[in-house]
Amino acid sequence: MPLPESVGDLVVLHFETNLDDHGISIGRAPCEIHEICWVILDGKTLEKQHCESCSIREDSSRHGICGSASSLTEAIFTLDNSIQERLNFQGKPFTFVVMNGRELRVLLPKEARDQGITLPSYMRHPRLFDLSSEYAKWQIRMGAVPPYTITLSHIFGKLDVDSLPPITESKAIELSPSDAPYITKGLTQCWRLANATTLLLRKAEKDSRGHSLPSVLTQPINCQADARSFYAERSKIVHVAGLTNDVTQLELESWFTNHGVHPVALWTLKTPEPYKSTGTGFVLFASHEDAADALAFNGYCLGDRMLEIIPSSTKVLDKASDILIPFPSSKNRPRPGDWNCPMCGFSNFQRRTSCFRCSFPGPTHVSAATGSNTFSPDFPYGNSYGNGSSHFIANYGGSVHHSNENTMQSDLQHQNGNNAVNHHHSSRSFGGNVPFRAGDWKCGSEGCGYHNFAKNVCCLRCGASRATAAVVADHASGPVNGSYSHNSYSHIPPVMSTSPPNHSVYPYSQLSINSVTANHGQNFGGQNGGNVSRFDDHGRFKEVSRPSVTTDQGDWLCECGFTNFRRRSNCLRCNAPHYSNMQIPASLPSDFNAYV
């Protein structure tokens, strides 16, 4: 069955490179084209008209249909002469056939640009068939599911390419016995690719059941028409392919920004796995000029992937609008059952019954108490758990991280250091009783009432001593001195910016052990042992024995009670900064060392 007249003859093209099936360079060497091979098929009979190869080596030679050139420029010139002689001069239309369209749309233009080669117009904006896509189209038409990655070996096996004679036994090509030893691997692959094209058309013709045209290899990709439309419409949209499946919005934005263009919006396509990208997407720019400049980055690498950046249009974007979503914002992929804390937004593993960061009860506790499977708190920053929490965190200095091994320690330090998302909201604010933990205490200073963790020896808000505070006895006890009203959020600490904190935020992080000892004697971090006062589990003072503590010159004591070596500029526990010239606050208790 002949191909449509608009398709014309087929030029099966194959490049021998150091890329694997995924377009990634093998080894550390940059991508290079080692050989160009081509086979010309008649568009009406599918008979092979000509085949040739040109290897890129240091010396130039020719052995029949196999030749070599000293540079890519000479190899492209040889290919152009062959096409001009057999097709263009005779006025025959033709279409390229490649295993992967990226070879002709990305790889060849990149190599030509890097080496300063001017490609013929039909190679800069080719008309081509992507054989892997055409094969997938045929598989879907037959009711089969094509593999995620279609390789040459897969196509050759499914189409039984070896049923056709190899190049050395073909009668269509006059090959002398002396030339047979010079047949290269690349030319053999190109010949098999031409056989696969022929077999695919035959199978499609058989399956078309009387239709005038086959179902494959009828509508080529016309890069020249796409480019004309892009510049005529002054489009601001480009299509990007070749991305890794876990690329994030920030990575892609930064990549374009680093190359001098600033994208306005980026989208990828929906996938069954919500946290996984398809490796393709659309990028919208503020102006047509920026989008045109972005096309010049076609073939540039993001990591170890070579990107394909081609023109697109508003029409294409509108047709795909129903399946477009933003790129993932993070590489973390929550597993089924993981839940987001409605109070601080922290992502917790399924097994956790309370939030790892702020101890807010998990969904199992709430559902057990209310008989519901979802959170339904009267939450001022979101209507359900997992929604609106990022707004809460943005206003109160928190951050959202998945509770994996790499972020556990840093999240604990944030929890200890800034207390921006403590678990002391009132029971009425969150639809359930949120008790203090044993040892937690509420500041007794007038007008403060701040809820401090048990480790805090002084109020983190006003600096008042813990000695005058009321202490919760155990987990069963509610907030001391009553609970907060529904609209009261005065106990939320001030927002902590990312700029270096002032002395009022970390009032005790500036103290050195030796300066405290000089002002308060041996009872504070001194070298003598003895009995010191500590709070017991019921909030009462008790005398406990303390072993001798030896501190080095310059060691300093943080607000959280952690003793840091002098070399540390930030507290190891809470990350509070240390300023050696800060004065000791008057509210520092004389027995401060008892809580270290």
UniProtKB/Swiss-Prot annotation:
Nucleus as UniProt keyword: yes
A single GO molecular function term of this UniProt record: zinc ion binding
UniProt-listed Pfam families: RRM_1, Zn_ribbon_RanBP
A GO cellular-component term linked to this record: protein aggregate center
Subcellular location: Chromosome; Nucleus; Cytoplasm; Cytoplasmic granule
Zn finger residue spans: RanBP2-type: 335-364, 437-468, 552-580
InterPro entries recorded: Nrp1_RRM, Nucleotide-bd_a/b_plait_sf, RBD_domain_sf, RNaseH_sf, RRM_dom, Znf_RanBP2, Znf_RanBP2_sf
Protein name per the record: RNA-binding protein involved in heterochromatin assembly dri1
Residues carrying Phosphoserine: 176, 429
Top-level lineage group: Eukaryota
Reported consequences of knocking out the gene: Abolishes siRNA production from the centromeric outer repeat region. Decreases H3K9 methylation and impairs heterochromatin silencing; simultaneous disruption of dpb4 exacerbates the effect.
Species the sequence originates in: Schizosaccharomyces pombe (strain 972 / ATCC 24843) (Fission yeast)
Gene3D superfamilies for this protein: 3.30.70.330, Ribonuclease H-like superfamily/Ribonuclease H, Zinc finger, RanBP2-type
Function in brief: Mediates heterochromatin assembly by promoting RNAi-mediated heterochromatin silencing and histone deacetylation. Binds pericetromeric transcripts and recruits the RNA-induced transcriptional silencing (RITS) complex to heterochromatin. Recruits sir2 to chromatin to promote deacetylation of 'Lys-9' of histone H3. Involved in bipolar spindle assembly during mitosis. Required for proper localization of kinesin-14/Klp2 on the spindle microtubules.
RRM domain boundaries: 236-314
Miscellaneous comment as given in the Swiss-Prot or TrEMBL entry: Shown to localize to the nucleolus in PMID:16823372 by overexpression of a C-terminally tagged allele, however this allele was subsequently shown to be non-functional in PMID:33693625.
Keywords: Chromatin regulator, Chromosome, Cytoplasm, Metal-binding, Nucleus, Phosphoprotein, Repeat, RNA-binding, RNA-mediated gene silencing, Zinc, Zinc-finger
A biological process term (GO) from this entry: regulation of heterochromatin formation
Assembly with partners or alone: Interacts with dpb4. Interacts with chp1.
Comment, domains: The RNA-binding domains (RRM domain and RanBP2-type zinc finger domains) are essential for DRI1 cytoplasmic localization and function.
